[in-house]
A protein has these predicted regions:
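Ligand-binding grooves and catalytic loops that recognize ribose/phosphate and carbohydrate rings
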Residues: 72, 83-100, 104
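Repeat-mediated protein-protein interaction surfaces in helical alpha-solenoids
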Residues: 17-30, 112
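Ankyrin-repeat intra-repeat helix-capping/turn positions
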Residues: 20, 47, 82, 93, ...
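Short, intrinsically disordered, charge-balanced linker/junction segments flanking boundaries
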Residues: 125-128, 135-145
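Hydrophobic repeat-domain scaffold segments
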Residues: 42, 46-55
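Ankyrin-repeat boundary/"N-cap" motif
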Residues: 2-16, 34-45, 64-88, 110-130
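Ankyrin repeat domain, specifically the short helix-to-loop turn at the C-terminus of the second helix
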Residues: 25-34, 54-62, 95-108, 139-145
């Protein structure tokens, strides 16, 4: 990961997904350009299909690898990405990255449990349909799941 520590990656995942502050994620990318290509998780969050495919070519099991802070896999992180929701110009990259992950064995029904008073299961489908309101990615997950 070069100058990208596991803690920095976890902070980026927190900022770039779900309800995270995207400005913070952008600041981290500016300060640490290697973060964008540090892992399959960061590539997925950014909709970098070529990057996702490179990680899968090196290690196909990366499709199901989990990462802090939530314990999500790359597909779940992709579907909860703030970039997916806020930048529709990245749609082709996100759909291609999701397809590559699914082809490599990612679980279209996968997710993670939140912690707190009322734990909930956050899934890829919830991210695509309920958070990003992304019909193409939602359809892909339903077809595969």
């Amino acid at each position: 990961m070069g100058d990208v520590t596991p803690e920095l990656q976890a902070s980026f995942i927190r900022a770039a997904t779900w309800h995270g502050p995207l400005e913070e994620a952008e600041s981290m990318l500016g300060a640490h350009p290697g973060l964008a290509v540090a892992s399959i998780h960061t590539a997925a969050i950014l909709g970098d299909a070529d990057g996702v495919r490179r990680f899968l070519a090196e290690d196909p099991s990366a499709a199901t690898a989990t990462a802090p802070p939530y314990g999500g896999d790359p597909l779940v992180h992709l579907c909860l990405s703030r970039y997916l929701r806020l930048d529709r110009s990245r749609t082709p990259g996100f759909v291609a990255a999701a397809t590559a992950l699914l082809d490599a064995g990612a679980d279209p029904n996968g997710g993670f449990w939140t912690t707190g008073t009322y734990p909930e299961r956050e899934t890829a489908l919830y991210g695509a349909a309920g958070v990003a309101h992304h019909p193409e990615l939602t359809r892909l997950l339903l077809e595969r799941g």
